[in-house]
Regions:
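Short Pro-Cys-Gly-centered "Cys-loop" motif that presents a nucleophilic cysteine in a tight turn
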Residues: 2-135
Length: 135
């Protein structure tokens, strides 16, 4: 991102430094439980980092859209999120309950490892399928 934009952004939000820390990290994620776990992981990151005590307090999170239906310009719900319940209210309640539970420690470690290394996050069969497509 251009230096002028970063300077303007920092001035606008009374901050300093680079806009993004480190390299952008990405990995292929299988839907099913892995995608929802990643969404929970991402939305709870500001809480784990001690930036906020409630995920809804973090301005840049999609948590308020998922948990309370707050409209967000750059947000569109994932199919799996929509399948959590048949009504908006129940989906939001389900999401709040899901995010109130900690992400399983083993799964949390897998998410971190795959996102840091660019490995595929999913079942063995899914990882093999992605590997075949990449070759």
């Amino acid at each position: 991102v251009g230096r002028l934009y970063v300077r303007k952004f920092n001035y606008s939000y009374a901050r300093s430094g680079t806009l993004f820390e480190g390299r952008f990290k990405t990995c292929v994620v299988q839907e099913d439980q892995y995608l929802l776990a990643c969404l929970r992981y991402i939305e709870l990151n500001p809480v784990r980092a001690g930036m906020v005590s409630d995920p809804g307090d973090y301005r840049w999170s999609s948590y308020r859209a998922h948990a309370f239906g707050v409209k967000a310009q750059l947000w569109s719900p994932q199919r799996l999120y929509l399948e959590l319940a048949d009504s908006c209210r129940r989906r939001q309640q389900t999401w709040r309950a899901m995010t109130a539970e900690a992400v399983n420690g083993e799964l949390l470690a897998k998410i971190r490892h795959c996102s840091n290394t660019g490995l595929v996050l999913g079942t063995e069969a899914f990882r093999e399928q992605v590997q075949r497509l990449r070759n």
